[in-house]
Amino acid sequence: MKHLLTAADLSRDDATAILDNADRFREALVGREVKKLPTLRGRTIITMFYENSTRTRVSFEVAGKWMSADVINVSASGSSVAKGESLRDTALTLRAAGADALIIRHPASGAPQQLAAWTLDEHGGPSVINAGDGTHEHPTQALLDALTIRQRLGSVEGKRVVIVGDVLHSRVARSNVALLHTLGAEVVLVAPPTLLPVGVTEWPVTVSHELDAELPLADAVLMLRVQAERMNGGFFPSSREYSVRYGLSEKRQSTLADHAVVLHPGPMLRGMEIAYSVADSSQSAVLQQVSNGVHVRMAVLFHLLVGSEEEAISA
């Protein structure tokens, strides 16, 4: 496997191997005074973030450094992009500089696929990892969500996962639907009709507009942020009405099964899609997701750049 561009790129075996190795990396780092493994020593990883990010950017950087890679961060404002350089020329420059992996977040859907095509050479070119492209996909987020569900519930297969909120603009939802289906989960989308994409009836999901009917049946609930920055208005009457209909309040949380887990990809709009008390409750796995993000991204880098399970943990 050369690139990770969409969650659909992952077979069940690939996804399971990445989740298993994420757990192995986590266990290998427990108790270490210096959190360093030699797995990617001598490799160069370049992150290219053209949209704001905290969790994804930091976790990729930490993942690379914990594996002893050289990690270089490139942003639009601090590079020749600010002078008008195209993404293609930037990509070719970074390939020529010797990058082993390019990790890209970009507002344009399909940018990672273009990057992979542009940087292909007689040696194969660098591996490209999609860290979020427009409203299209965010495959490593889906992997860390699946890992969190597996850790909390024992497995993903057969679990009922309810995804709530702004599905229309959510790359997280698209990647989660694909990966959770691959891993054998049942996926339910809950959203107002205006926040569901055209063609959603063709997805391997059940669609509902009634959150209260779905929560008691859920093993996991993934709350999505309303992405106002991608909207022109008119998708729902008001923030208050949205919260009343689709927010995970403390009262709604009480209808969840005791074993159910609450997830959120962040950043959270506390008080809108999720109540303060719910976000901080024992059922919430938000911080566990962040921690898992580092280990999953270590496993993804390993899977693409090394590939041999026997060498995953050394020294």
From Swiss-Prot:
Q: Name one GO cellular component term.
A: cytosol
Question: Any one Gene Ontology biological process term?
Answer: 'de novo' pyrimidine nucleobase biosynthetic process
Could you tell me the superkingdom of the organism this chain comes from? Answer: Bacteria
Q: Which UniProt keywords apply?
A: Pyrimidine biosynthesis, Transferase
> Pfam families from the xrefs?
OTCace (PF00185), OTCace_N (PF02729)
Give the binding site residues for L-aspartate. Answer: K83, R171, R225
**Which PROSITE patterns did the record assign?**
CARBAMOYLTRANSFERASE
Please list the GO terms describing molecular function: amino acid binding; aspartate carbamoyltransferase activity
- Extract the coiled-coil ranges from the record: none
> According to its UniProt record, which reaction does this protein catalyse?
carbamoyl phosphate + L-aspartate = N-carbamoyl-L-aspartate + phosphate + H(+)
Q: What class of enzyme is it?
A: transferase
- Positions contributing to carbamoyl phosphate binding: R55, T56, R105, H138, Q141, G266, P267
Q: Which InterPro entries match?
A: Asp/Orn_carbamoyltranf_P-bd, Asp/Orn_carbamoylTrfase, Asp/Orn_carbamoylTrfase_sf, Asp_carbamoyltransf, Asp_carbamoyltransf_Asp/Orn-bd
Q: What is its EC number?
A: 2.1.3.2
Q: In which pathway does it act?
A: Pyrimidine metabolism; UMP biosynthesis via de novo pathway; (S)-dihydroorotate from bicarbonate: step 2/3
Query: What job does this protein perform?
Result: Catalyzes the condensation of carbamoyl phosphate and aspartate to form carbamoyl aspartate and inorganic phosphate, the committed step in the de novo pyrimidine nucleotide biosynthesis pathway.
Which family does the record claim for this protein? Belongs to the aspartate/ornithine carbamoyltransferase superfamily. ATCase family.
Subunit structure, as described in the record = Heterododecamer (2C3:3R2) of six catalytic PyrB chains organized as two trimers (C3), and six regulatory PyrI chains organized as three dimers (R2).
Q: What is this protein called?
A: Aspartate carbamoyltransferase catalytic subunit
Q: What species is given as this protein's source?
A: Mycolicibacterium gilvum (strain PYR-GCK)
